Amino acid sequence: MSDTPASTFGGRRAVPPNNSNAAEVDLPTEELQGLVPRGVNLKDYLNVTAVHLFKERWDSNKIDHHTDKYDNNKLIVRRGQTFYIQIDFNRPYDPRKDLFRVEYVIGRYPQENKGTYIPVPVVKELQSGKWGAKVIMNEDRSVRLSVQSSPECIVGKFRMYVAVWTPYGILRTRRDPETDTYILFNPWCEEDAVYLDDEKEREEYVLNDIGVIFYGDFKDIKSRSWSYGQFEDGILDTCLYVMDKAEMDLSGRGNPIKVSRVGSAMVNAKDDEGVLVGSWDNVYAYGIPPSAWTGSVDILLEYRSSETPVRYGQCWVFAGVFNTFLRCLGIPARVITNYFSAHDNDANLQMDIFLEEDGNVSSKLTKDSVWNYHCWNEAWMTRPDLPVGFGGWQAVDSTPQENSDGMYRCGPASVQAVKHGHVCFQFDAPFVFAEVNSDLVYITAKQDGTHVVEAVDATHIGKLIVTKQIGGDGMQDITDTYKFQEGQEEERLALETALMYGAKKTLNTEGVVKSRSDVTMNFDVENAVLGKDFKVTITFQNNSSNLYTILAYLSGNITFYTGVSKKEFKKESFEETLDPFSSKKKEVLVRAGEYMSHLLEQGFLHFFVTARINESRDVLAKQKSIILTIPKITIKVRGAAMVGSDMVVTVEFTNPLKETLQNVWIHLDGPGVMRPKRKVFREIRPNTTVQWEEVCRPWVSGHRKLIASMTSDSLRHVYGELDLQIQRRPTM
């Protein structure tokens, strides 16, 4: 086959872009050199009669390549590792006089130098890192080959041909979709850029199709299961379609750096008709609220079938879908949650909270926001484009926050580089550094236009960074992979390095902060249950021999989890007198009627307490977010939990509120157990229970989960889950 196909494109670009896995052109079945003499029948020479790929789930190809979980009847292998095929001929193969080779082709304009046309020669011995095919069996009319792919091979769906040489040219098999072969990244191959040397980590970060995503508040961490479903029917093709939709050149699809960067742009629909439309305004017309999704499968399959972005997602939904994309293609990946995450538009390492002179927060001047939590992903890969030591986990974020090189995407940024302040290395390291390292600065805006720094909290941002633990549903603290402990010499050095490499710090807060006040203030919020009253307790402590009078303000706000306030539902001011070396508590009652009618998606309430000491004019400020405790869905099963056996799943929910829930949707999902399903209830009256039954037939054994969510006009973020142990069907 010629290295460059004929093209009508002229000028500097003689070959059109090859950016679609789905687009294809058939290779010719004959490539003859000159005329074939009369009486010569090319079928008398060696001809292929059948090709066997050993592509069933129980065949060694899929088991050895850890692809037996994919619900896909094509051959799926991982690059850099041998697999087996068998070719049947019309007569016995004689290696002394017969010559043939296997060919793999991807895209519409295949070229050998681009890796889109791969001729695989038959060799005596396979060489590490190179394509080759070795005959391991030659019996009767059948030849079995051990085929080795390159560990740098393009990742995608290849078309396969077998070419046989005759004295008059090449004979080639016809295009046969049954021989199509998917080639994926290979974390089990030491020469692959995504190689991960720990089997338990590979089991978790590549093969686990159910995860746990953490959300809530630093003081009230909550978790929810998420069905990644990377092995479900149609998901692999959808992930390839996502790259096609991005018009990503096929030659770059073997590079995990490029694939993850394209994925971070394409999972959101901000500027490229990607997978998910983001919405943070609590209005979800013509779509599904973010909290209703139970996993990635419904989202990706809807995107593929409609070829339009799916509505709606927020950070944990973007992260869940992106995790599916990465794991499906073979890139080790995990979802990360950063508590108190700075959304720093200009990456100046500073979140400014402006106060008026009386101590109230100035909503007019305060533009920065601190997200209660933010989810992104980490992908494991080498970084040959960076200095040694910056490979490993890379932060990648598909939530559309800021523009990077003209598109809404973020990463991959080396986590190790972020920790040490080396923000000069691509991609988007300054933004990630700011998310976990910014200072929270309280500034009084004087009437004369001057600003006075009242306090700096250097420990609030990036308070805790977590992910799911390996082999369990618990939480693993990975904060120390992103930052050194506050006060360590290494932490100061990392900040200085970041500033040297271009990170900005608007205000020099060193030495500007006022001296420590004689009075300290703290406040606590008791466990708040949705629909119930609760108390906020503020404590003042006078550590001096002076008498002080205090004017304090409490502001309660309904907030998005992004820290943006929607509605102030509680405002109270009070005065307290503090005797020397004394403490005093103030209790404020918050009634359910004050907040219920204003609630948003996740039930976040944010309290801000400021106090001014009249005698010293010192300002004290504290803030705290809470998430209301929300009722759960109950899931029960009856029947044998066995592959191929019917099992009845019952979903049950009781409305604990005093109001009727309208337009209720319940979503149910369980990878390997049942396909995602939805059920609508027109209403659920107060203290009324609804039930929904579905019959399913599991097809995957081992530990499985059923995951349910409920959403309505006035109540969302309701979840439930059930762990299952699905037994194998006994062999007869």
From Swiss-Prot:
> In which residues is Ca(2+) bound?
N437, D439, E486, E491
| Post-translational modification as stated in the protein's UniProt record | The activation peptide is released by thrombin.
Q: What does UniProt list as catalytic?
A: C315, H374, D397
Name the coenzymes or cofactors required: Ca(2+)
The places in or outside the cell where this protein is found are: Cytoplasm; Secreted
Return the annotated site residues (Cleavage). R38, G39
Propeptide per record: which residue ranges?
A: 2-38
Gene Ontology CC annotations of this record: collagen-containing extracellular matrix; cytoplasm; extracellular region
Query: Where in this protein does the record say N-acetylserine is found?
Result: S2
The reaction(s) annotated as catalysed by this protein in its Swiss-Prot or TrEMBL entry are: L-glutaminyl-[protein] + L-lysyl-[protein] = [protein]-L-lysyl-N(6)-5-L-glutamyl-[protein] + NH4(+)
Q: Which residues form the signal peptide?
A: none
Which superkingdom? Eukaryota
Q: Which InterPro entries match?
A: Ig-like_fold, Ig_E-set, Papain-like_cys_pep_sf, Transglutaminase, Transglutaminase-like, Transglutaminase-like_sf, Transglutaminase_animal, Transglutaminase_AS
Q: Name one GO molecular function term.
A: protein-glutamine gamma-glutamyltransferase activity
Recorded hits in Pfam families, A to Z, give: Transglut_C, Transglut_core, Transglut_N
EC annotation from Swiss-Prot or TrEMBL: 2.3.2.13
Q: Which residues are glycosylated?
A: N614
Give the record's GO biological process terms: blood coagulation; blood coagulation, fibrin clot formation; peptide cross-linking
Annotated stretches, region: Disordered: 1-26
According to the record, how does the cofactor bind?
Binds 1 Ca(2+) ion per subunit.
UniProt family annotation? Belongs to the transglutaminase superfamily. Transglutaminase family.
Q: Summarize the protein's role.
A: Factor XIII is activated by thrombin and calcium ion to a transglutaminase that catalyzes the formation of gamma-glutamyl-epsilon-lysine cross-links between fibrin chains, thus stabilizing the fibrin clot. Also cross-link alpha-2-plasmin inhibitor, or fibronectin, to the alpha chains of fibrin.
Which PANTHER family does the record match to this protein? COAGULATION FACTOR XIII A CHAIN, PROTEIN-GLUTAMINE GAMMA-GLUTAMYLTRANSFERASE
What is the name of this protein?
Coagulation factor XIII A chain
Organism whose genome encodes this protein = Mus musculus (Mouse)
